[in-house]
Amino acid sequence: MPTSLEQAAALIGGVGTHLLYFKHGERHAYPWRYVALLLAGSLSLWAFKWSREGTTTSILAVTSSTSVLLFLYLGGLAGSVLLYRLFFNPLNRFPGPFAARLSKLYFVYLSSDLRGHRKLHELHQKYGRYVRVGPNDLSVVDPDGMKIVLGANSKCTKSAWYGQDMPYISTNTTRDRAAHDRRRRILAPAFSDKALRGYASRLQKFHDLLTSQIDASAGKPMNVTKWFGYWGMDMMCDIVFNGSFNMLASGETHWALQVVGDGLHLQGFALPPWLYRVFATMPKSSSGSRGLAAFAATQLENRMQQQGKTAHADMMQPLIEHYDRLSTDTKRAILPLLQGDSRMLIVAGSDTTSTTLVHMFYRFCKESGLVDRVREEVEPLVSDPNLISYSDIRQAQLLHACINETLRLHYPGPSGFFRKTPPEGIHIGEQHVPGDTIIQMPPYVMGLDEEVYERCSEFVPERWYSKPEMIKHKDAFLPFLAGSESCIGKNLAYIQLAVVASQIILQFDVAFAPGEDGNKLVRESKDLGMLHPEDLHVVFTRRGKTHS
């Protein structure tokens, strides 16, 4: 057995490791290094003890002694962590499940069905606006906090969540604000008004393909989740890479669409960053994210070979132009970021837009008379339903209100964005949130708050124009965030949604397919960081000619 002094040293060493190291800063990036250090330290201790005691004791005794010291060290480390979380953590004054004080794994357990956004809603209904969901994690639905946490002048920064996919990086996951802003300025020309006007005719091609497929299925059940997904992916591949997977034309799912879903799957478990890193570095569990990264890298390589030869500008053009001006060494360093941006543009642009469109048509089917009212508004503004310019429908209030109301009730990133408070903490009204707290403001929960939105569970698009009094806290709605961290594709998203929705409803009536009520879409869609919608089956019926 080890001496009393050795046992005390091991125990104190474990406590000190927590208090002097793990308690300070972020230690999530390389979890396997700690495993390696622990093994190396244990073997070194065993070798040292054998060299000192090997002549008088057995291998088994030395091994047993080393194991006891290892157990005491880990016990001291774990005990210190638990005692701090139970009695000294400044977040202890916030309500929440007791188990959440001890470990974020409790919320992982709650989210094991990949519907974490719905679990957050249940927790907020039970505990209130501020809920502790982990030892250092708060979920907040206080509308006064939106601009403080996510606004243009927020002192909060991106949390470790944005770095858990290393070495895969992108502009969106860049946590250094100055570096993010520099990269965003390079990307900005791809989203300028001039660029968006240039994309219009190319987007129209995919709107036409979608309406053609709707026409071919007219009178029969159609899975709009599938077809709107094809539309989103084909469209974004065209304006990002100057290419398409032709899923709308062929009606067949390209393997890349499955890769995108697989690449996001691990995020759905709401793992703490250190545990995410464990799984992200294991071949089987990380196959989805690695497949997505490889897919984007291949698409980028093909696109780079076409630089200067494409007939139309695309979103990668300014990024590749900037890359080509760099030195060889700088290119080598910046290539992962370029690959990451190509992945970001495809996933963020296709998934979020198509998901919103699916839920918008769910509401067109569910809300009696809604699609007729939108049609009556849009129809006088359009001369040809097969060639709609966004400038013609820009002022269509009800149409755009339907988009906003869909984003309120069915936000494509339902659990929100993870931010880290500054060292001094932040104040939301009279509530002080301690420094270095991981804070999220789930839009799904905020959208269902009666103190924020009157008749919050009802789809009332008029709240966005003719009945503004139904929005009690206007700052609570930030679907595209604000400032330099805002979604750079906001204007493109509104254009895509408004134009394609108008083109469809001007030519077709829409209703739920027999046996469909949309409940599966609403209740069973998965939260994978972004909402992964369940199938929605509707029936489109060709309308009579209404335009000369």
Curated annotation (Swiss-Prot):
GO terms for molecular function: heme binding; iron ion binding; monooxygenase activity; oxidoreductase activity, acting on paired donors, with incorporation or reduction of molecular oxygen. The chain crosses the membrane at residues 28-48, 68-88. It is a multi-pass membrane protein. Its EC number is 1.-.-.-. Its cofactor is heme. It is found in: Membrane. Pathway: Secondary metabolite biosynthesis. Induction: Expression is positively regulated by the leucinostatins biosynthesis cluster-specific transcription regulator lcsF. Keywords: Glycoprotein, Heme, Iron, Membrane, Metal-binding, Monooxygenase, Oxidoreductase, Transmembrane, Transmembrane helix. Heme binds at C487. InterPro entries: Cyt_P450, Cyt_P450_E_grp-IV, Cyt_P450_sf, Cytochrome_P450_monoxygenase. The keyword Transcription does not apply. SUPFAM superfamilies: Cytochrome P450. Glycans are attached at N172, N223, N242, N404. GO terms for cellular component: membrane. It holds the Pfam family p450. Cytochrome P450 monooxygenase; part of the gene cluster that mediates the biosynthesis of the lipopeptide antibiotics leucinostatins that show extensive biological activities, including antimalarial, antiviral, antibacterial, antifungal, and antitumor activities, as well as phytotoxic. Belongs to the cytochrome P450 family. This is Cytochrome P450 monooxygenase lcsK. The lineage of its organism: Eukaryota, Fungi, Dikarya, Ascomycota, Pezizomycotina. The gene is lcsK.
